[in-house]
Amino acid sequence: MVGYFPPLVEQVRQVGLPLTVVELDERWLQQDGQFEVTLEPEKLNDCSKIICTGTVLVNQTIDGLLPCFRNASQIFIVGPTVGCLPDPLFDRGITRLGGCSVLDTVQFLGLWTAQEKWRASTRRYVLSRDSTYPGCSQLLNNATRGLNN
């Protein structure tokens, strides 16, 4: 995993699966049996599944991490900061993106401004490289056809 995401870390630990988390913030560093939080991305080389928080897109660390994902069959980037077209990421080997879209803007802004949890005002989604996602080019073609009709 890239990025210490406490709710997800707890879910994985409760199941008892081995988990390595790469983090930039030293205050999260720890090791306990099959669980480790490290500063060393190379420790992901042997992982078969990788989950990254969307922060890897925001802080532009994804390119430096990709070589460490080469043995992973599944690579996910998840979180509210993943609202982007997936094509360039799919082309680089990312298999799924999970994000959220705002359903109720007024409710969302009220909750966000009050620094409260805003999940109730959003809907989660997953885009998969192997799904029916048509690709950016096809989306643009469809939009252009719609404008010309």
Regions found by a protein language model. Name each.
Residues 12, 44-45, 67-72:
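Short, conserved loop/helix-junction motifs that constitute active-site signature segments
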Residues 76-149:
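C-terminal functional extensions of proteins
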Residues 17, 70-74, 94:
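A short helix->loop->beta-strand "cap" motif at the edges of active sites that frequently abuts
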Residues 49-53, 76:
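Structural motif
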Residues 4-7, 22-28, 80-84:
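Short, polar loop motifs at secondary-structure junctions
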Residues 1-21:
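Internal active-site segments that recognize and position negatively charged phosphoryl groups
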Residues 34-46:
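Short acidic low-complexity segments
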Residues 11, 61-68, 88:
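A short acidic, amphipathic alpha-helical/loop segment
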